[in-house]
Amino acid sequence: MAEVVLRHLVAEDPSLSGRVEVTSAGTANWHVGCPMDVRARGALDRAGFTAEGTPAAFADRRYLDGHDVVVAMTREHVHDVNQRLTNRSTQVVLLRNLVEPGRNLDVADPYYGDDAEFDACLDLLKRGGQRLTSEFRQRLGEDSFEA
């Protein structure tokens, strides 16, 4: 869901469109190659997003080192990503810190929940995505990323 939201926000912003590439991958390989969960797609549809995400991918060392910024959903993901990175210039950001700075809270995984939990997760992802695109606009003119 985060990929779809962020792709949408970047595409809508002329200062970012064509300059920021959005991809996504998981820190575990459970769902590699699988399409998006139907409940996630439903939440995106209800919110008016076109859910054209790519099949699930795995965030291995090669994948991660090719990115400037990696946005993680949980503290465990931050740890996993940092363990795999060899490119130390890649910045790892906990998404929820963009919405609630300094609290170091995870984005709750709605996988075992109902539609309401997917909708709540999507709302958080939208807020984080808006903050992230704001940071990207600033970053394109600066060397630091605040999160």
Model-identified regions with their sequence ranges:
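Short polar/charged helix/loop
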Residues: M1-A147
